[in-house]
From Swiss-Prot:
Residues 97-109 have a biased composition (Gly residues). Expressed in seedlings, roots, stems, leaf blades and panicles. This is Homeobox-leucine zipper protein HOX21. GO terms for molecular function: DNA-binding transcription factor activity, RNA polymerase II-specific; sequence-specific DNA binding. Residues 179-223 are annotated as: Leucine-zipper. GO terms for biological process: positive regulation of DNA-templated transcription. Residues 25-75, 88-126, 233-278, 299-328 are annotated as: Disordered. GO terms for cellular component: nucleus. It comes from the Eukaryota. Belongs to the HD-ZIP homeobox family. Class I subfamily. Residues 121-180 bind DNA.
Length: 360
């Protein structure tokens, strides 16, 4: 298996137009995979015998006129010697690849992999010194946006690559935005706290004003109620005084028909005693003096008087005597007569009592 690997490595390393490789392709019969599997299981010595048996000694290649580095037919090594050189040749690409990576690191191939401070990522990180950082900070304060000309000037002045300067400005701008957001947040939070405190103070003041308004309304309602009670008491007292004065006036003034009522029975009795013989044929007897019209008043209608006096018990009652034909009054209600005869303008149907005093 190792010999197969050594045999295949020169063909993959050298170009396909290599003369030895061409000679092997021309001389070698088609390779059987079963025989290759058989070689894999039987040792290196058996593998060499099988290769010699199938391949045979390769013919010497003719010298190549265009490639002086290739060996001639006399100097061409055998296949076994070439296989011995394959391990040494196989190690060359690996060392070359390592060397190429180191060259890229020296030449600054890892520009994209930079850390936050502008240094390269990897085993060898290049960090910026203090002077470079100060210069970049001053330029960042002048303007956080980096133009291409300015980037090239800074790179030449600081001995850095333009990509490093651009990445440093990008990271610095991100940190600046974060700090700016924190500052804005703190300022807005302070403003919010101040507004909340002011709002709480206004709410407390509003509550106090509402309480004062309620107290003032209660006082006004109480004062209005007190004034209304005073007015009611004053009106009630005025009414009571007026009623008491009316009662006193009524009690002090005597009834106007009391003297006439007292004198009426005496005069009637005198008239009845003096003219008993000639009074029988008169037929019409005048009423009492209480129904006489006042000096300034008018008369009363006889129909109205009789109608009102006939319905109640307060009217005058008259009795007829068979001997002399005289009429005698039994009882008279002074109040009803006063109410009936007040304000009547018609003349009385009979003569008043004082006009008939000549009968005595």
């Amino acid at each position: 298996m190792a010999s197969n690997g050594m045999a295949s490595s020169p063909s993959s390393f050298f170009p396909p137009n290599f003369l030895l490789h061409m000679a092997q392709q021309q001389a070698a019969p088609p390779h059987d995979p079963q025989e290759h599997h058989h070689h894999h299981h039987h040792g290196h010595h058996h593998e060499q015998q099988q290769h010699h048996h199938h391949l045979g000694p390769p013919p010497p290649p003719p010298p190549h006129p265009h490639n002086p580095f290739l060996p001639s037919s006399a100097q061409c090594p055998s296949l076994q010697e070439f296989r011995g050189m394959a391990p040494m040749l196989g190690k060359r690409p690996m060392s070359y690849g390592d060397g190429g990576g180191g060259g890229d690191e020296v030449n600054g191939g890892g520009e994209d992999e930079l850390s936050d401070d502008g240094s390269q990522a990897g085993e060898k990180k290049r960090r910026l010194n203090v002077e470079q950082v100060r210069t970049l900070e001053k330029n960042f304060e002048l303007g956080n946006k980096l133009e291409p000309e300015r980037k090239m000037q800074l790179a030449r002045a600081l001995g850095l690559q333009p990509r490093q300067v651009a990445i440093w400005f990008q990271n610095r701008r991100a940190r600046w935005k974060t700090k700016q957001l924190e500052k804005d947040y703190d300022a807005l939070k302070r403003q919010l706290d101040a507004v909340k405190a002011e709002n709480d103070a206004l709410l407390n003041h509003n509550k106090k004003l509402q309480a004062e308004i309620v107290a003032l309304k209660g006082r006004e309602a109480a004062s209005e109620l007190i004034n209304l009670n005073k007015e009611t008491e004053a009106s009630c007292s005025n009414r009571s005084e007026n009623s008491s004065e009316i009662n006193l006036d009524i009690s002090r003034t005597p009834p106007p028909d009391a003297a006439a009522l007292d004198a009426a029975p005496t005069a009637h009795h005198h008239h009845h005693g003096g003219g008993g013989g000639g009074g029988g044929g008169g037929g019409m007897i005048p009423f009492y003096t209480s129904i006489a019209r006042p000096a300034s008043g008018g008369g009363v209608d006889i129909d109205q008087l009789l109608h009102s006096s006939s319905g109640g018990a307060g009217g005058p009652k008259m009795e007829h005597h068979g001997g002399g034909g005289n009429v005698q009054a039994a009882s008279v209600d002074t109040a009803s007569f006063g109410n009936l005869l007040c304000g009547v303008d018609e003349p009385p149907p009979f003569w008043p009592w004082p006009d008939h005093q000549h009968f005595h």
